[in-house]
Amino acid sequence: MAAVKELIRTEENQTLSFGDYELDQKAKLSDYPFEGDMYKVKTYKDITKLERNGMFVYESVPGTAVMNLTQDDTGMTFSVEGPEDAQITVEMEADTEYEIFLNGASTGKVKTNLGGKLSFSAELENADVVAVKIEKC
């Protein structure tokens, strides 16, 4: 896995990959069509952010590369990599409890706020890739 040089792309398995944490200058790509929605990505070494139809989906500080992102009514899955540990925030259903799994191990349950934001840390510095699964309880 590596940075997504084209900033965002659709994978053969109909998932999204995005983010290039190797960039020194901010880059963005808007109006990327995927499954009837329009996506926008902003990414560089300090932050990676994804929006769907103008609404928040994902943000990491510092920047990361995300592969095979899928989201449905029950949760979200993706793989993430970056040069150092990252704080990741995703948009889920508001005021709902989710369990977060990193590389198959539960990190516990977290309840989203009224805006639906869910935040967690991922230890990326000494890892090749971290598999993330967020599951509705």
Where are these regions (language model features)?
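Short, solvent-exposed mixed-charge patches
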Residues: 1-2, 137
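Catalytic cores of secreted or luminal carbohydrate-active enzymes
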Residues: 2-67
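A generic structural signal for short, non-catalytic loop/turn and secondary-structure boundary residues
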Residues: 9-11, 16, 71, 81, ...
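C-terminal beta-strand-rich structural cap/linker in extracellular carbohydrate-active enzymes
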Residues: 27, 31-42, 49, 86-88, ...
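Beta-strand-rich interaction surfaces with strong enrichment in secreted/lumenal proteins
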Residues: 65-68, 75-78, 108-110, 119-123
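Hydrophobic residues positioned within well-ordered beta-strands of beta-sheet architectures
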Residues: 76-78, 100, 132
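Surface-exposed beta-strand/loop patches in extracellular or lumenal glycoproteins
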Residues: 79-96
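Short strand-turn-strand beta-turns centered on an Asx-Gly dipeptide
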Residues: 101-105
